[in-house]
């Protein structure tokens, strides 16, 4: 009975983790946002892109904080196709519930700016995820020791599990539209994507537990204020079963005079959850950003406002050329 109860608790925590993992800098991990963004909308001097995100949250509430790490590579195959792949790892709390996902991505431009300002792209992803947990990371009722006034993990739990890891097939799809007209001051964009298309069984027991499909709608616009300043309002809506996220934000990019460098400042609000502040720096199409979530939900009473710290790095390069420009020497 204890094993069944623990397994049920694991399934609940697994579902909660899959719904509560956020990337505040979601636009820095485009394949995680929408497979239709794979290998597209590069600048003229860019053929490929490397990006990575790291996030840690709930450090104030859990003995082991929730962590998310992602890494990705994508490139344009020609003027119509983009290909890439990404890996993301989520690890949550006690029991080290871990989900490692690897997906290959592909995109196709149905319409592009060679024929006009309207750009429409579709994309698909396929791959595998591995989900596991460590039963030694939990405590059990028979490990309670009155003499120690707490749990003694050196006492055998007496519990056995048929399996502590599963591998499942994963797939997703998306569509993305962007209006691109360099002579215009506003260039809007919107996308839609669906993840967990096969509704994989994520149960560690013989009882099936299907992962609900995850729906994402995202959009915004690039507004050119002048030659040095750009404002980008954005909105993100995600829904999975009965859980949803609404994220609204505004960021500003300012080009430093007489340089190719830009600095960025942004503020987002995740509905009934967190206020997100982020800063960034861009040089030669490489972007580094750091953000912090200030918790505003009911958990604020326990977290003291401390939410999640996140970093992202995006590197863009051209085939046959160094990824980083050599530093000029001062004579």
Annotate each PLM feature:
Residues 1-4, 112:
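Positively charged n-region of N-terminal signal peptides that target proteins for export
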Residues 13-15:
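N-terminal signal peptide c-region/cleavage motif recognized by signal peptidases
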Residues 5-9:
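Sec-dependent signal peptide hydrophobic core
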Residues 10-11, 204:
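Short, linear, compositionally biased motifs with a strong N-terminal bias
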Residues 1, 18-19:
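Absolute protein N-terminus
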Residues 19-331:
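Subset of outer-membrane beta-barrel
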């Amino acid at each position: 009975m204890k094993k069944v109860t623990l397994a049920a608790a694991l399934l609940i925590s697994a579902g909660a983790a899959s719904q509560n993992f956020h990337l505040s800098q979601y636009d820095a991990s485009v394949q995680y946002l929408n497979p239709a963004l794979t290998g597209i909308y590069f600048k003229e001097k860019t053929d490929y892109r490397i990006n990575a995100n790291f996030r840690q949250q709930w450090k104030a509430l859990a003995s082991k904080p929730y962590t998310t790490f992602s890494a990705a590579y994508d490139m344009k195959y020609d003027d119509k196709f983009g290909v890439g792949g990404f890996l993301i790892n989520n690890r949550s709390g006690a029991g080290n519930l871990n989900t490692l996902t690897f997906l290959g991505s592909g995109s196709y431009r149905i319409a592009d700016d060679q024929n006009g300002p309207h750009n429409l792209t579709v994309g698909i992803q396929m791959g595998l995820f591995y989900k596991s947990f460590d039963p030694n990371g939990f405590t059990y009722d028979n490990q309670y020791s009155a003499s120690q006034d707490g749990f003694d993990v050196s006492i055998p739990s007496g519990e056995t599990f048929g399996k502590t890891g599963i591998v499942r097939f994963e797939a997703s799809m998306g569509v993305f539209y962007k209006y691109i007209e360099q002579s215009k001051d506003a260039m809007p964009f919107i996308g839609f994507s669906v993840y967990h298309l096969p509704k994989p069984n994520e149960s560690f027991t013989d009882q099936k537990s299907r992962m609900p499909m995850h729906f994402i709608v995202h959009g915004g616009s690039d507004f050119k204020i002048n030659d040095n300043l750009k404002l980008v309002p954005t909105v993100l809506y995600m829904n999975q079963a009965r859980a949803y996220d609404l994220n609204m934000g505004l960021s500003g990019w300012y080009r430093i005079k007489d340089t190719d460098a830009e600095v960025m400042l942004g503020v987002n609000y995740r509905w009934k959850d967190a206020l997100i502040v982020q800063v960034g720096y861009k040089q030669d199409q490489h972007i580094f950003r750091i953000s912090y979530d200030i918790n505003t939900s009911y958990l604020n009473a326990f977290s003291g406002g401390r939410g999640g710290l996140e970093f992202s790095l995006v590197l863009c390069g051209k085939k046959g050329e160094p990824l980083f420009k050599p530093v000029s020497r001062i004579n």
